[in-house]
């Protein structure tokens, strides 16, 4: 890892609660198959639970896992920005490249999402996209099927030094 870089990692599985989803549970991709704050199906559309969590259980998980994770992330972003004048959040996770339930075709290796350029400075978007596009043996796309999850959209505020 680069000197001065820090990490904030979720220590819970995304099936418990998905840290990349909005706390309200609203869909980032209305009209498309997706999973929620507490996923009820896997990426093949198959049920995850014998008995689905009710609203009270979902709220308990939100408070126990989602909220503390995002409080830690917000605090770290503020600390880094206060120290350096800028903070860059690189929100990354893995996913299968072929999931017919969620999308047609095969995903590129790198799926860079900046919510159509609203969550980071143009220079950061261009540099990241160029590096990924030029990585030997890998494919990349900018703002394709995944345009940036809730974390990217919520914290990406370039005018405030948060990218």
Locate predicted features.
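N-terminal catalytic or cofactor-binding beta/alpha core of small enzyme domains
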Residues: 1-89, 94-162
